Amino acid sequence: MAIVKCKPTSPGRRHVVKIVNADLHKGKPYAPLLEKNSKSGGRNNNGRITVRHVGGGHKQHYRLIDFKRTKDGIPAIVERLEYDPNRSANIALVLFADGERRYIIAPKGLKAGDTVQSGVDAPIKAGNCLPLRNIPVGSTVHCVELKPGKGAQVARSAGAYAQIIARDGAYVTLRLRSGEMRKVLSEGRATIGEVGNSEHMLRELGKAGATRWRGVRPTVRGVAMNPVDHPHGGGEGRTSGGRHPVSPWGMPTKGFKTRKNKSTDKYIVRRRNK
């Protein structure tokens, strides 16, 4: 994997920094594991905008990723690594001994020809998936289940990982990249290692158009709007009317807590670093 800084042959290329991975498959993805991925433009069934700054972008197929890893005891060979436009991590196409193919999140160090496995008897090796109760304390894991059988929900993006720091009865304690320490049911599964493509954070898109290719539209500041459009709108010159920063719907935007699910607070041992 290499970090390439483009030559300034045009204003749009001057600031581009690309991540080039020669190990990624250059052909088409595996068709049986593709699904249609329709764009909504941020509109709901009434045609009204419910998510701002969404629209346009390149057409994409959704890759069906195996987040549950339930084929226990059947080894699988990594056929190739692929780019996935729907996530920051790369994905791996694996071929099981019974002939089935699935996509999984590609962990750091995984390459074509490697063998991965899932189940309680799987060895502690990058890419193998086991219940948390069978993984040694101190291990680094990713693709962690919060609810057993639901599929991985934690540490799925490029470079993400969690560390098992304690085991207590039916729960294990994880330290996340954010610094948060959280209890998770030990019956839930996790994959050994950290997610690959950690250099993803170093890329620079270089121009506004590259953001538009990804389906992201421009953001207009509230103070540049009219009073009918935003609480900060109107006034002569740039003035917010002396009001603390709020969203278009009047919700404070800096330091205001919006977490609603208080029932799971008991699982958080320590809040994230700020």
UniProtKB/Swiss-Prot annotation:
Location of the region described as Disordered in the Swiss-Prot/TrEMBL record: 223-274
Domain of life of the native organism: Bacteria
GO BP annotations, alphabetical order: cytoplasmic translation
Pfam families (alphabetical): Ribosomal_L2, Ribosomal_L2_C
Single GO molecular function: transferase activity
A Gene Ontology cellular-component term: large ribosomal subunit
Keywords: Ribonucleoprotein, Ribosomal protein, RNA-binding, rRNA-binding
Alphabetical list of Gene3D superfamilies matching this protein: 2.30.30.30, Nucleic acid-binding proteins, Ribosomal protein L2, domain 3
Entry similarity comment: Belongs to the universal ribosomal protein uL2 family.
Quaternary context: Part of the 50S ribosomal subunit. Forms a bridge to the 30S subunit in the 70S ribosome.
Function, in words: One of the primary rRNA binding proteins. Required for association of the 30S and 50S subunits to form the 70S ribosome, for tRNA binding and peptide bond formation. It has been suggested to have peptidyltransferase activity; this is somewhat controversial. Makes several contacts with the 16S rRNA in the 70S ribosome.
Protein name: Large ribosomal subunit protein uL2
Organism (species): Aliivibrio salmonicida (strain LFI1238)
